[in-house]
UniProtKB/Swiss-Prot annotation:
It comes from Sulfurimonas denitrificans (strain ATCC 33889 / DSM 1251). It holds the Pfam family Ribosomal_S5_C. This is Small ribosomal subunit protein uS5. One of its GO terms (biological process) is translation. One of its GO terms (molecular function) is rRNA binding.
Length: 146
């Protein structure tokens, strides 16, 4: 599958900072979680770690392009209800009528918007960890039957 990176938009879902205390002070490292999508049914997510934020974001974007997946979209919404669990995060996605918009919070919204879904109702249950929520959402979208 030949991809043109210019067709894709990216959204930074989360940037985290971890600190290592050493003799000379504190050493910071950054993690970035990024979602990429072309708003036409192709979506990917990736994580990156580096000593500087821009480097972490670049690594995350590169990883996101390495694991792209197709999503089945029916008009402006999804074909049917679906519930998916990944680790402690559970996500429930329901189709919505046109004009409803994306009713989603936190890390779920950028995934759905970049996939090209315009009308959907969602509920996240359990852990609100951005990484597991994004993965649960992408896996749920991948399980949709056309």
């Amino acid at each position: 599958m030949e991809i043109n990176r210019e067709d894709f938009e990216e959204s930074i879902v989360n940037i985290g900072r971890v600190t290592k205390v050493v003799k000379g002070g504190r050493r910071f490292r950054f993690t970035a979680l990024v979602v990429v999508g072309n708003k036409k049914g192709t979506i990917g997510f990736g994580a990156g770690k580096a000593k500087e934020v821009p480097d972490a974001i670049k690594k995350a974007v590169d990883n996101a392009f390495k694991n792209l997946s197709k999503v089945s979209i029916k008009g402006t919404t999804i074909a049917h209800d679906i519930e998916h669990k990944y680790n402690a995060s559970r996500i429930l996605l329901k189709p919505a009528s046109e004009g409803t918009g994306v009713i989603a919070g936190g890390a779920v919204r950028p995934v759905l918007e970049l996939a090209g879904i315009k009308d959907v109702l969602t509920k996240s249950i359990g852990s609100n960890n951005p990484g597991t929520l994004v993965r649960a959402t992408v896996e749920a979208l991948g399980r949709l039957k056309g």
